[in-house]
């Protein structure tokens, strides 16, 4: 019979485990080499119990949760629990064999022993700017096989009994275009584990076997909390279909992401039957990422105070037919899977909005708008530079608040890449514009968040540009009469003649010349409620702040605003009353 632990001790241990995850996260961010990790913070860390269940994870990227939830069970399956030793570290990146979400996401896990007793694990995952493959940045819009996307790392040891295995590190570094940066980032990940293991050992020495008992109770508590919320919902089936734009010229037609959610008592089932089949293009979503998307959606709707751990997964059932785009078969390409993965929460939120009126949000930018620029001339000894940025967009609105502008949504939660960091690290790139894009937030009583317009000029010839995005065709939807958010777009401005060319949403390795400018516009977000009910004073403030144009204020909100001197704005009360 499991030992009963008092709730105060469980809560203290929960916060202790969270502090361990947060401390190791901070170590990686502070010591990593690449801007991907130290600026964008494309990193996630977790504490895992001896049985392989996640019990505490830092609140960073929801997209990275799926990989860490499966890494320890995969280690046990391949090596056997009895063959895991103190001082070991395991590494992987292959989503089909216990690794990351796509090949650039490298997960490392380390066991914590006290004497001969395995008392827990520490795991982290981080996005590396290049791990080989057909294009710089290891992420393209046209790969038709996983083998084109970089080196595949099954679950293997990189350290054994406190000793680095040099041959494994050499193999990884020889398969990247930027080996110095890769070595620095991998060292940061491994160094964080040295502290993480130490902290778990200290926790065990303090709490003894009660530590594992608290871990089990935390998982059980999260499951109970989710089931308790589900039990209050009306039984029934709730369905929604959203769409991915397609994938380049090869797949121009929309791809449906269809979910049917069944509520029965305290049971919740997500059925993706009817979703598009897998394709020979890199937007297939590995099943661990689909699982993470459901995990995120459940937690977002049911309470941010529910501890994020394996208990949430235990409270739900997922049906994702093998061979569909959200559960592809090996070796389907998955490099740009995040654009499709983003649509899973959108579909779930759309389905459950009628029974979650207080927490439902409209569709946000729903993309992972990626810009990769690669050329000669990196800082340090590496022969090339690879600039990788994910640009934010609009956040969804709800019944009680406007959407946030210029933020990552759903599965992504990376930080802004400051202009100063960009130009300091990448001296051949000049930022020409970085601002919110007027009128991209959907109109509503609560306005959707705005997308961003970003312009980057290249200062040398022979730079390759890859641009990956979505919602360039399908607008982010609104709720309860709210309007759609703006779509995204990629443009090239030629240095030679100033001509502007719109590019596809999956542009791969486009050659640029010195002085060419890449213009990226990210999607906005849908609005919530009748825009004519938005207080005129709020519309005025939106106009003053450049979020809504004078024309949109009149046409969409029914608010007439004057600007006779070009400086001061005022509401024309009579004209507004007539329109409304």
Language model region names:
Residues 1-86, 91-580:
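Glycine/proline-enriched, intrinsically flexible loops and inter-domain linkers
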């Amino acid at each position: 019979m499991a030992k009963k632990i008092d709730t105060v001790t469980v809560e203290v241990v929960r916060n202790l485990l969270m502090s361990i995850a947060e401390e190791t996260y901070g170590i990686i961010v502070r010591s990593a080499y690449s801007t991907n990790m130290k600026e964008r913070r494309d990193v996630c860390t977790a504490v895992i119990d001896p049985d392989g269940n996640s019990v505490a994870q830092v609140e960073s990227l929801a997209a990275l949760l799926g990989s860490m939830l499966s890494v320890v069970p995969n280690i046990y399956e391949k090596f056997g629990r009895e063959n895991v030793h103190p001082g070991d570290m395991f590494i992987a990146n292959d989503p089909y064999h216990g690794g990351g979400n796509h090949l650039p996401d490298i997960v490392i896990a380390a066991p914590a022993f006290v004497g001969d007793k395995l008392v827990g694990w520490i795991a982290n995952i981080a996005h590396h700017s290049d791990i080989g493959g057909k294009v710089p940045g290891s992420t393209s819009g046209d790969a038709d096989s996983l083998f084109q996307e970089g080196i595949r790392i099954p679950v293997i040891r990189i350290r054994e009994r406190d000793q680095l295995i040099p041959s494994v590190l050499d193999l990884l570094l020889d398969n990247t275009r930027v080996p110095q940066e890769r070595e620095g980032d991998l060292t940061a990940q491994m160094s964080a584990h040295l502290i993480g293991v130490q902290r778990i050992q200290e926790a065990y020495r303090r709490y003894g076997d009660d530590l594992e008992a608290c871990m089990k109770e935390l998982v059980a508590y999260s499951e109970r909390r989710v089931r308790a919320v589900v039990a209050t919902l009306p039984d029934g089936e709730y369905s929604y279909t959203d769409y991915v734009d397609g994938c380049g010229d090869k797949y121009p037609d929309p791809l449906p992401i269809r979910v049917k959610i069944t509520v029965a008592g305290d049971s919740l089932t997500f059925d993706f039957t009817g979703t598009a089949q897998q394709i020979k293009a890199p937007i297939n979503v590995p099943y661990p990422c689909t699982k993470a998307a459901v995990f995120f959606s459940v937690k977002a709707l049911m309470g941010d105070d529910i501890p994020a751990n394996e208990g949430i997964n235990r409270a739900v059932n997922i049906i994702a037919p093998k061979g569909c785009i959200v559960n592809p078969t090996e070796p389907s390409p998955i490099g740009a899977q995040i654009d499709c993965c983003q649509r899973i929460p959108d579909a779930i939120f759309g389905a459950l909005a009628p029974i979650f009126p207080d927490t439902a949000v409209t569709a946000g930018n729903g993309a992972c708008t990626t810009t990769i620029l690669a050329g000669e001339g990196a800082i340090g000894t590496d022969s090339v530079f690879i600039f990788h940025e994910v640009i934010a967009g609009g956040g969804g609105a709800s019944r009680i608040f406007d959407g946030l502008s210029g933020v990552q949504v759903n599965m992504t939660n990376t930080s802004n890449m400051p202009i100063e960091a960009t130009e300091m690290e990448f001296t051949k790139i000049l930022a020409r514009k970085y601002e919110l894009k007027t009128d991209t937030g959907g109109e509503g009583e609560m306005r959707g968040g705005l997308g961003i317009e970003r312009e980057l000029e290249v200062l040398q010839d022979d730079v390759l540009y890859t641009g990956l995005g979505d919602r360039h065709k399908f607008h982010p939807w609104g709720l309860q009469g709210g309007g759609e958010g703006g779509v995204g777009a990629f443009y090239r401005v030629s240095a030679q003649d100033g001509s502007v060319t719109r590019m596809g949403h999956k542009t791969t390795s486009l050659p640029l010349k010195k002085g060419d400018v890449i213009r990226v516009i990210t999607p906005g977000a849908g609005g919530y409620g009748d825009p004519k009910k938005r207080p005129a004073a709020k519309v005025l403030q939106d106009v003053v702040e450049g979020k809504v144009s004078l024309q949109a204020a009149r046409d969409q909100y029914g608010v007439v605003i004057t600007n006779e001197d070009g400086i001061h704005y005022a509401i024309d009360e009579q004209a507004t009353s007539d329109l409304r």
